[in-house]
């Protein structure tokens, strides 16, 4: 449902050139390629293993309109202009938003739009960013509009944190049910005790996210969508 909502709010249409910044394991890039077969979808990730996974999934699904570029976003330069640029949970890991938005503005076609999905906090003290997103941040709702130039926010939406709280609870339950297999997968690359420690850390992370995003009916920590 969130993938479809992302496409709707981004104003994606078949035949567009779509660039996803920080595509992760390809959920949105693959979904967009499947649902908009006349579009060209380019994902950017700093992980070669993510690129291999996405391209493998594309082959299995018979999708020939997906490309993945492995690059650090601080050094990335887009291959041409795009009708839509989409970023889902990447801006939290970037520091100089003004410079990033300036660069993105140069990657958009004349009628192009940027869609940003980002975690945010009601307050601007970044408490959660300091304690749970080391190296990243938890911006306040008005940060992006303040630094958007040369772009400007056309429309914005708030998704209550309760949705992400339920997602975190589901991830936690899934990890509990598959803890043995997950630990085995990590054992080898990691010593056995470190593998178990990593599983416990993920359990704590999911529980923390569920509690924090569910706090105060999801009004304190939440998700924001912006179209620029």
Label each PLM-derived region with a short phrase:
Residues 1-16:
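Conserved alpha-helix/loop element of class I SAM-dependent methyltransferases that forms part
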Residues 15-24:
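Conserved class I S-adenosyl-L-methionine
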Residues 54-55:
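Conserved SAM-binding loop
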Residues 61-73:
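Conserved SAM-binding strand-loop segment of SAM-dependent methyltransferases
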Residues 74-85:
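A short acidic, Gly/Pro-enriched loop at the edge of an enzyme's catalytic core
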Residues 98-113:
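A short glycine-rich, Lys/Arg-flanked "PGG" loop and its adjoining helix->strand segment in the class I
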Residues 120-223:
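Substrate-binding/catalytic lobe of Class I Rossmann-like enzymes that use SAM or dcSAM, i.e.
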